[in-house]
Design a protein with these regions (language model features):
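A cross-kingdom marker for long, charged
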Residues: 43-116
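Extended amphipathic alpha-helical interaction segments
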Residues: 1-62
Length: 116
């Protein structure tokens, strides 16, 4: 599930970036083209995400004792732990989508400035 949630978040962030680009007339991309472009990269995003998640988990949990790690695993399996994880993802996904949109809009403004 961790990989799936991160892949979905990355795909949504990429769509948000394209939508940000489309705030400029210079990048008038139809929504269906944005979605095709983003979906065409799903396999690449998934592979990158799997690598990232493995590396992140290795680094993040390496200094934790086995006992503390087991406590975290136990918490993650409870309804409260699952709700906490969903809340974290919802917050991060909203933030990444907003930032991606703003970066796309800034890139569009920058490119228009270059054309002038």
């Amino acid at each position: 599930k961790l990989v799936e949630r991160n892949v979905a978040g990355a795909l949504n962030a990429n769509v948000a970036f394209f939508r940000g680009l489309s705030t400029s007339e210079a990048f008038d991309l139809p929504e269906d083209q944005m979605l095709r472009d983003v979906w065409s990269r799903e396999d690449e995003i998934r592979a990158d995400t799997e690598d990232w998640v493995f590396g992140y988990m290795t680094m993040a949990y390496q200094p934790i004792s086995d006992e503390k790690l087991q406590s975290y695993v136990d918490l993650s399996g409870t309804e409260a732990g699952k709700a906490l994880n969903r809340a974290f993802f919802a917050g991060f996904e909203a933030l990444f989508e907003e930032v991606s949109f703003e970066i796309g809009a800034a890139a569009a403004r920058f490119s228009i400035g270059d054309e002038l």
